[in-house]
């Protein structure tokens, strides 16, 4: 209700007296008993003046001026205020009102053309697959292959008995593969290769069992290149069986020259021609040498055991 209507409801007009509306007797009594009677008369006159000015201004306004929007309270019947109130209620409750829907349509039409002309960019289309909207087809199982990949597969649907027989039983002990029946069939295409016969030998004999077939140079190579190994011991034993002796001081192997007898022999030493094997130059050298029996390694001839 406007200010003019409220004042008119109180019967306050420019030519009427506030006391007249109440009654003559009451007005005189108030004048006699109210010490602020002079002040009330001035307030009544001021209010009457304001009402007269409002009515005069209202009568002078043209229809076009009366419909001009007021920046504080737009519209005489507060229609814009009600529209704004309905918008707030729509935002809070999530329900759109007719006024808000009409305004949305006006706003979209006021922009460049209509919203139907707007097209999505490739970047927007690629971004949709990482949003929550992309999970809806998977949850609804619209694509069976994609649902199996994302959500997995029920083992019971594959014919596997999941009834717990034992508490510590593992599924891997019974279910080797969902496609285990395919392993019994022959492959569609045979591989184009042949396996060599050497790959089919199972547990070949150890190399030490064939050490008697090696040459002297091979035995020397094994002895000097495999220290503290079982093959070094086997090579030393085989060289001893072939009449080679190891000199502990010189750290070389020597043997008497075949067909030549010792020039001198005693219980402690003997002198004659011997064949030495030089590991540095890797060759055999013939020398006249005085051999002390105590300098030789004490090793008896015996078979090499694997």
UniProtKB/Swiss-Prot annotation:
The keyword rRNA-binding does not apply. Transmembrane segments: none annotated. InterPro entries: CCR4-NOT_su2/3/5_C_sf (IPR038635), Not2/3/5 (IPR040168), NOT2/3/5_C (IPR007282). The keyword Plastid does not apply. Residues 1-44, 56-79, 94-126 are annotated as: Disordered. Belongs to the CNOT2/3/5 family. Acts as a component of the CCR4-NOT core complex, which in the nucleus seems to be a general transcription factor, and in the cytoplasm the major mRNA deadenylase involved in mRNA turnover. NOT2 is required for the integrity of the complex. The NOT protein subcomplex negatively regulates the basal and activated transcription of many genes. Preferentially affects TC-type TATA element-dependent transcription. Could directly or indirectly inhibit component(s) of the general transcription machinery. PANTHER family: CCR4 NOT-RELATED. This is General negative regulator of transcription subunit 2. The lineage of its organism: Eukaryota, Fungi, Dikarya, Ascomycota, Taphrinomycotina.
């Amino acid at each position: 209700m406007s200010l003019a209507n409220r004042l008119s409801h109180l019967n306050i007009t420019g030519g009427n007296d506030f006391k007249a509306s109440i009654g003559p007797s009451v007005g005189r009594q108030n004048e006699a008993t109210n010490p602020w009677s002079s002040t009330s008369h001035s307030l009544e006159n001021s209010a009457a003046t304001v009402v007269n000015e409002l009515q005069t201004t209202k009568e002078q306004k043209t229809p076009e001026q009366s419909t001009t929007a007021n920046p504080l309270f737009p519209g005489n019947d507060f229609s814009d205020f009600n529209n704004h109130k309905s918008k707030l209620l729509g935002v809070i409750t999530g329900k759109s009102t007719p006024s808000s829907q009409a305004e949305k349509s006006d706003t979209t039409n006021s922009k460049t053309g209509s919203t139907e002309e707007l097209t999505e960019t490739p970047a927007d289309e690629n971004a949709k697959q990482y949003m929550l909207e992309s999970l809806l087809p998977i949850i609804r199982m619209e694509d069976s292959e994609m649902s199996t990949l994302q959500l997995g597969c029920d083992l019971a649907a594959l014919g596997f008995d999941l009834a717990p027989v034992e508490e510590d039983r593992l599924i891997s002990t019974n279910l080797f593969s969902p496609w285990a029946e395919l392993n019994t069939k022959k492959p569609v295409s045979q591989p184009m290769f042949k396996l060599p016969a050497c790959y089919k030998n199972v547990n070949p004999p150890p190399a030490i069992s064939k050490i008697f077939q090696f040459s002297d140079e091979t035995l020397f190579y094994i002895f000097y290149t495999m220290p503290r190994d079982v093959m070094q011991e086997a090579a030393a034993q085989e060289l001893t069986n072939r009449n080679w002796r190891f000199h502990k001081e010189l750290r070389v192997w020597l043997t008497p020259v075949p067909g030549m007898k010792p020039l001198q022999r005693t219980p402690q030493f003997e002198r004659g021609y011997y064949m030495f094997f030089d590991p540095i130059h890797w060759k055999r050298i013939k020398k006249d040498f005085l051999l002390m029996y105590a300098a030789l390694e004490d090793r008896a001839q015996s078979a090499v055991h694997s």
